[in-house]
């Protein structure tokens, strides 16, 4: 026949590991959402600062910002 059945004896359930036991508490709050805005404003500030940082790096890379005392070849 073209099909073959697999015995269910190979399915022994999830295997417990030391790493899994250590990481289990981190997943205990899965699916729960804190009421209100939470840390959203903090994340917005972090994203804005990161965008400013990236724009400064881009301007330095493009030599559009002149830095005194630093020679650019």
UniProtKB/Swiss-Prot annotation:
Transmembrane segments: 41-61
Pfam families: PsbH
Primary subcellular site in the record, as a coarse category: plastid
A molecular-function term among this protein's GO annotations: phosphate ion binding
Domain of life: Eukaryota
Membrane topology of the entry: Single-pass membrane protein
Residues modified to Phosphothreonine: 3, 5
Subunit comment: PSII is composed of 1 copy each of membrane proteins PsbA, PsbB, PsbC, PsbD, PsbE, PsbF, PsbH, PsbI, PsbJ, PsbK, PsbL, PsbM, PsbT, PsbX, PsbY, PsbZ, Psb30/Ycf12, at least 3 peripheral proteins of the oxygen-evolving complex and a large number of cofactors. It forms dimeric complexes.
HAMAP family: PSII_PsbH (MF_00752)
Official protein name in the record: Photosystem II reaction center protein H
Provenance organism: Piper cenocladum
